[in-house]
Amino acid sequence: MPKRGKRAAAEDGEEPKSEPETKKSKGAAKKTEKEAAGEGPVLYEDPPDQKTSASGKSATLKICSWNVDGLRAWIKKKGLDWVKEEAPDILCLQETKCSENKLPAELQELPGLTHQYWSAPSDKEGYSGVGLLSRQCPLKVSYGIGEEEHDQEGRVIVAEFESFILVTAYVPNAGRGLVRLEYRQRWDEAFRKFLKDLASRKPLVLCGDLNVAHEEIDLRNPKGNKKNAGFTPQERQGFGEMLQAVPLADSFRHLYPNTAYAYTFWTYMMNARSKNVGWRLDYFLLSHSLLPALCDSKIRSKALGSDHCPITLYLAL
């Protein structure tokens, strides 16, 4: 990913979150070195996949979601190799930064994922963008949330299947200095209403980079980030209101309510990933009627290729 100056980052509102630096004693510094080397409790280990539901039904659907931070760069970093090995039934991508007429040819080589749908801004090359790739042809596909103010940046794809509706989203970042926080709040309200309407028709699966760490357990340094994009009271409240109003359940926290150090994003700065100084910004949210079908919700923290890692959902439908 090319380095961007502060001015450009503030304008586009997509500046990666930075962690506040704190002075460390020699003892603390040694502890940090040990943790970075994997000797402390800080690193997250993805447990073995659970491929049956609570009632014993075997998983029939595997969905993966990944903010790739640029399709072309992600492919160069062997992101497609991971997808081929993971072999999802549906793959959702965010921050593709690629218009549909410039999609890399390698995407056509993905085994089975022949039904491909893309959305990108019409006037901003190399910005935002989402993709949805599926083995099965959806019954219906639509783009955006039906409001002009929010449908200019290629952030949402909706795919309807027989037993559920899948929404993949790249939610707007409030930006460095919170320059887009007011816009983000308008988005949150409109998105919530949109999802509630969808959920009234069929059970809903929402996945993607939702650009908020919901609770303090969902980021490494909560105290230092309460005024930073992704952890403001307004964004956290908006997320909570969405969970209640639609309603939706956080699949990872449903299964792992107290699991700490489970993050999906790490800034490129300050060796954040090796120290696991991260944020959980990527989610699979489910209608409550789908919870009996939930087998597992995974964070593939060892998969490289972006400043986010992929997440995987198993359902027994």
Swiss-Prot record:
Recorded family membership: Belongs to the DNA repair enzymes AP/ExoA family.
Class in the EC hierarchy, top level: hydrolase
Protein function: Multifunctional protein that plays a central role in the cellular response to oxidative stress. The two major activities of APEX1 are DNA repair and redox regulation of transcriptional factors. Functions as an apurinic/apyrimidinic (AP) endodeoxyribonuclease in the base excision repair (BER) pathway of DNA lesions induced by oxidative and alkylating agents. Initiates repair of AP sites in DNA by catalyzing hydrolytic incision of the phosphodiester backbone immediately adjacent to the damage, generating a single-strand break with 5'-deoxyribose phosphate and 3'-hydroxyl ends.
Organism, scientific name: Rattus norvegicus
Site (Cleavage): 30-31
Sites where the protein binds Mg(2+) 1: 69, 95, 307
Residue pairs linked by disulfide bridges in the UniProt entry: 64-92
Region (Mitochondrial targeting sequence (MTS)): 288-317
Intervals of motif Nuclear export signal (NES): 63-79
Lineage: Eukaryota, Metazoa, Chordata, Craniata, Vertebrata
Cofactor requirement: Mg(2+); Mn(2+)
Cofactor info, note text: Probably binds two magnesium or manganese ions per subunit.
Keyword presence, Oxidoreductase: no
Residues with Phosphothreonine modification: 232
Activity-regulation annotation: NPM1 stimulates endodeoxyribonuclease activity on double-stranded DNA with AP sites, but inhibits endoribonuclease activity on single-stranded RNA containing AP sites.
Region (Necessary for interaction with NPM1 and for efficient rRNA binding): 22-32
Keyword terms of this UniProt record: Acetylation, Activator, Cleavage on pair of basic residues, Cytoplasm, Disulfide bond, DNA damage, DNA recombination, DNA repair, DNA-binding, Endonuclease, Endoplasmic reticulum, Exonuclease, Hydrolase, Magnesium, Metal-binding, Mitochondrion, Nuclease, Nucleus, Phosphoprotein, Repressor, RNA-binding, S-nitrosylation, Transcription, Transcription regulation, Ubl conjugation
Gene Ontology annotations of biological process type: base-excision repair; cell redox homeostasis; cellular response to cAMP; cellular response to hydrogen peroxide; cellular response to Thyroid stimulating hormone; DNA catabolic process; DNA recombination; DNA repair
Subunit architecture: Monomer. Homodimer; disulfide-linked. Component of the SET complex, composed of at least APEX1, SET, ANP32A, HMGB2, NME1 and TREX1. Associates with the dimer XRCC5/XRCC6 in a DNA-dependent manner. Interacts with SIRT1; the interaction is increased in the context of genotoxic stress. Interacts with HDAC1, HDAC2 and HDAC3; the interactions are not dependent on the APEX1 acetylation status. Interacts with XRCC1; the interaction is induced by SIRT1 and increased with the APEX1 acetylated form.
Protein name per Swiss-Prot or TrEMBL: DNA repair nuclease/redox regulator APEX1
